[in-house]
Swiss-Prot record:
The gene is recF. HAMAP family: RecF (MF_00365). The lineage of its organism: Bacteria, Pseudomonadati, Pseudomonadota, Gammaproteobacteria, Alteromonadales. SUPFAM superfamilies: P-loop containing nucleoside triphosphate hydrolases. GO terms for molecular function: ATP binding; single-stranded DNA binding. Keywords: ATP-binding, Cytoplasm, DNA damage, DNA repair, DNA replication, DNA-binding, Nucleotide-binding, SOS response. It holds the Pfam family SMC_N. The RecF protein is involved in DNA metabolism; it is required for DNA replication and normal SOS inducibility. RecF binds preferentially to single-stranded, linear DNA. It also seems to bind ATP. GO terms for cellular component: cytoplasm. This is DNA replication and repair protein RecF. It comes from Shewanella loihica (strain ATCC BAA-1088 / PV-4).
Length: 360
């Protein structure tokens, strides 16, 4: 699976670009501020309906325009899918797939499994559990069709339960919703647990390549005491939840724990090793996706030379190549990437002041 064409209009500093893409490694180079990262961001926006650089989508629309337009052609075997997205400054979004309107952004995410490795993505190990839950849920969403419905119901019921807690609703009226919450929470938790187990198996070999002699243990915590029945816990914690105005325990508190011996990886590994660990996690996800549903991820790797030394750049690029995925890599100087490749990239693009040129 790969993107064969990408059209960008009024996105960041790119007024207009029409790109024919390679199905393997695509190298995009240019000075800081040239617009090279905007190409990655446009691909991400097309797959997720949002930016990985800003929570305010209006910021990606060019200053003198009222909308941005993105279009891509996706090829998987003999199947061809055309995806179009238009975002207005008002916040309205129009999405079409093969000419038909798409109502849910999750349809985009399902169609384009995108993995991002940027300087900011290394916060996966430093921030709170939310980013690690999102990491788990990316894989659960793509590999188990029942996950999204159960996850959406957990979110909906938790929101309603928290509103009732803020309104000081008696537990007798909350009890029905707790039963529903427990039902969907158990589905979400089982899928997450199973996914992390499968991911761990794929991760071991990659970590051996990236971090030899480092034994990283990965475990999943579900968000409440595994020895306690969730229904019983919700009832027992009702007074505390009522006082706090929100639900303290549940699948919304799940986490992915990574340790070396008894220490969290943040305390046991150097910054460089942690960067490699995040890369290993992303590659393991891509390989597991291919194994379980025979679908490749699309990797967006921003500013690779500044994050890893030459040897580890070469190792990462080789691992990405081994996945069979389409990869987009940005750099200031092309030599920093070219020197790390065993085979030349499929396509090379130069970006300068928002103008994109193909380098033959």
């Amino acid at each position: 699976m790969s993107l064969s064409r990408l059209h960008i209009d009024s996105f960041r500093n790119i007024a207009s670009a029409q790109l024919q893409l390679g199905d393997g490694l695509n190298l995009i180079y240019g000075q800081n501020g040239s617009g090279k990262t905007s190409i990655l961001e446009a691909i991400f926006f097309l797959g997720m309906g949002r930016s990985f650089r800003s929570h305010l989508s209006q910021r990606v629309i060019q200053n003198d325009q009222d909308k941005l337009t993105l279009f891509a052609q996706l090829e998987q075997g003999e199947q061809e899918t055309k995806i179009g997205l238009r975002r207005y400054r008002s916040g309205e979004t129009e999405v079409k797939m093969n000419g038909e309107k798409v109502k849910r952004l999750s349809t985009l995410a399902e169609t384009l499994p995108i993995q991002v490795i940027t300087p900011e993505s290394f916060s996966l190990l430093f921030e709170g559990p939310k980013s690690r839950r999102q990491f788990i849920d990316w894989g659960a969403f793509h590999t188990d069709k029942s996950f999204y419905t159960a996850w959406a119901n957990v979110r909906r019921i938790l929101k309603h339960r928290n509103q009732m807690l803020k309104s000081e609703t008696p537990y007798q009226q909350i009890q029905f919703w707790d039963k529903e919450l427990v039902r969907y929470a158990e589905i979400v938790t089982e899928i997450r647990k199973r996914y992390v187990g499968s991911l761990n198996e794929r991760l071991k070999g990659i970590i051996e390549e990236f971090l030899p002699q480092v034994d990283v243990k990965v475990s999943f915590t579900r968000g409440w005491d595994s020895k306690t029945d969730y229904q019983t816990l919700l009832q027992a914690q009702y007074p505390r939840d009522l006082a706090a105005g929100h639900t303290a325990s549940g699948p919304h508190k799940a986490d992915l724990r990574l340790r070396v011996g008894t220490l969290p990886v943040q305390d046991a590994l150097s910054r460089g090793q942690l960067k490699l660990l995040v890369c290993a996690l992303r590659i393991a996800q891509g390989k597991l996706l291919k194994q379980q549903i025979d679908k490749n991820s699309i990797y967006l790797v921003d500013d690779l030379p500044s994050e890893l030394d030459a040897r580890h750049r070469q190792l990462l690029l080789q691992q990405l190549s081994d996945t069979g995925a389409q990869v987009f890599v940005t750099a200031i100087e092309p030599a920093a990437i070219m020197d790390s490749l065993n085979t030349p990239p499929v396509k090379v693009f130069h970006v300068e002041q928002g103008r994109v040129t193909v380098i033959e």
